[in-house]
Amino acid sequence: MALKQISSNKCFGGLQKVFEHDSVELNCKMKFAVYLPPKAETGKCPALYWLSGLTCTEQNFISKSGYHQSASEHGLVVIAPDTSPRGCNIKGEDESWDFGTGAGFYVDATEDPWKTNYRMYSYVTEELPQLINANFPVDPQRMSIFGHSMGGHGALICALKNPGKYKSVSAFAPICNPVLCPWGKKAFSGYLGTDQSKWKAYDATHLVKSYPGSQLDILIDQGKDDQFLLDGQLLPDNFIAACTEKKIPVVFRLQEGYDHSYYFIATFITDHIRHHAKYLNA
Amino acid sequence: MALKQISSNKCFGGLQKVFEHDSVELNCKMKFAVYLPPKAETGKCPALYWLSGLTCTEQNFISKSGYHQSASEHGLVVIAPDTSPRGCNIKGEDESWDFGTGAGFYVDATEDPWKTNYRMYSYVTEELPQLINANFPVDPQRMSIFGHSMGGHGALICALKNPGKYKSVSAFAPICNPVLCPWGKKAFSGYLGTDQSKWKAYDATHLVKSYPGSQLDILIDQGKDDQFLLDGQLLPDNFIAACTEKKIPVVFRLQEGYDHSYYFIATFITDHIRHHAKYLNA
């Protein structure tokens, strides 16, 4: 599992690095970013995974979210993968901004031609953690996950499909009920085919209804002026209703005047990192 | 002086906006970013001008520096212009990344074909402040300036050439002695011609030697692993020697392991905004 370092920049006393590797799950080269806080120089740290939204690479979060100060203070290694395989020469992979490249939706595709490469679910939950645990000073037992929009969807389903794997989960403007929203219908029909039962296995609102697991403290921030909320792409109300019914605690904060941008994320990122640090450093 | 709003995003309770206008000085359309902190809703705030470095637009600083939290807390309106005129159809304007587009060097060009458009000094010190004072809730008497690299050079010369105009000045990795460094020689010979006395009028190290002005508290952060420092583009030692001789107080902090990137700026931006707030809110 050879890693090639692409960049390394000092930031808030730690190091923001980007690496490239040949992904076995995705059958292509993948980049990921990893932040090593000062504490990582002298011991193992918890690992916090960030999943980005549509059209993003590993760069958007590390350059725009302003997360480094709190990650440095709380001593968290923060990992941010790319949002899909790239350069797979699949016909149509670059045709839309909400499907294919930059839009892997954190699922394992079952349909041709996507199934050979589009396995972001297994990449994020299996291959990447194994790579991180093997190459960086992280404690494999202390892992949490969060994300934005499509990445918020990814964080929620990874946590709900793996009870106990993550200490905590949070999301910014997550796609909460993809089986019912335009983005989700387009992605799931393309990657998973027409059998909607396969869709539900990657839908947070459905997963909550049958969540058998342990305590899961979910934090969600949502901008009230988020165009995609108004367009019915995110559907947080459905998710909250399902959590309420199942008595799963979720803190949902509707933020007046905020939108879907990284300005919204930057404003509340410290709260989210504090949320995770509470569990990761417990 | 019609302003066209390009974008507006809520961030740390304030609004990060970008506007476009027809610049009289530069004879072209120019964009600038302005952050209005929550305090700007109820009263006039001080104005802090940021000047960016080579290849930047108004976007780099507002999306990568993480300045919003401290600007919001200290109640400062922060303005970030672009780094040169654009789209002027001057032969060669886009040929190099360190001259022409994205590289206006904050001077008023005297040479053809640049002198018609390349008047960034007057734009930054006259036209933009007049525009800001006329259109935003700012106190014209309370203004400070800071910048990075070429923008650090810009901030230093604007302050040194206008004693009393700015309450404070600071810089990240500034080009301190452009008449002696490759970037400066290329830019000044192109914009100002071969008469080196004209160059010195835009060189911070020379300007300090004849600075008649009032108290000026200068803060400079410089990454010790900054490739451009090692390449002799920045020359801070010359500037510090000149300040020492003239007994002008300058705090110069050499930061171990840091480079020229926005990760370096993000790490110390709060210190700089606090530095300015001390004088602007005095």
Swiss-Prot record, chains A, B:
NCBIfam families: fghA_ester_D. The modification N6-acetyllysine is found at residue 200. One of its GO terms (biological process) is formaldehyde catabolic process. The active site is at 149 (charge relay system), 226 (charge relay system), 260 (charge relay system). This is S-formylglutathione hydrolase. It comes from the Eukaryota. Signal peptide: none annotated. It comes from Homo sapiens. Belongs to the esterase D family. The keyword Acetylation applies. Serine hydrolase involved in the detoxification of formaldehyde. Its main location: cytoplasm. Keywords: Acetylation, Cytoplasm, Cytoplasmic vesicle, Hydrolase, Serine esterase. Changing residue 260 to A: 3% of wild-type activity. The gene is ESD.
